[in-house]
Amino acid sequence: MDNNRYDALKIENQLCFPLYACSREIIKRYTPFLDAIDLTYTQYIAMMILWEKKSVTVKEMGRCLYLDSGTLTPLLKKLEAKGFLTRVRSTQDERNLIVTVTEAGEQLRERAVSIQIGRASCRERV
């Protein structure tokens, strides 16, 4: 059997693996800073969308973050339980769920600014 035929399937020949490993490393380096504000990385990027847009549909947020509703729904419920956002059905189209940042969510933004300061030290170690 020709082993060269399978060389393309070796992990070191896959572009996807270094990207995956890099993504994992970035999240690992963010974790200590995010722990300080009691957010996961995915919750953090969801909040960044809300800080920028103030109010979005779940569908729009999913498009921005490349996440499906099955992943977003529990994440948004946890953020809502923490008081950082509200989820309300659209009065114009009840199929749409509108997510809006709360005052507590805006206050979290002020605390999250320190993430960007800490992130600079992450870049120095890479």
What residue ranges belong to the model's regions?
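Key DNA-contact positions within bacterial/archaeal DNA-binding proteins
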Residues: 42-44, 70
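N-terminal leader segment of winged-helix/HTH proteins
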Residues: 1-37
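Charged, amphipathic alpha-helical coiled-coil/dimerization segments
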Residues: 27, 77-125
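Residues within helix-turn-helix
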Residues: 58-59, 70, 77, 97
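Pre-recognition alpha-helix immediately N-terminal to the DNA-recognition helix
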Residues: 18, 29, 45-48, 107
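The alpha-helix within a helix-turn-helix
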Residues: 62
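Short, locally clustered residues in the helix-turn-helix/winged-helix DNA-binding domain
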Residues: 20, 48-52, 113
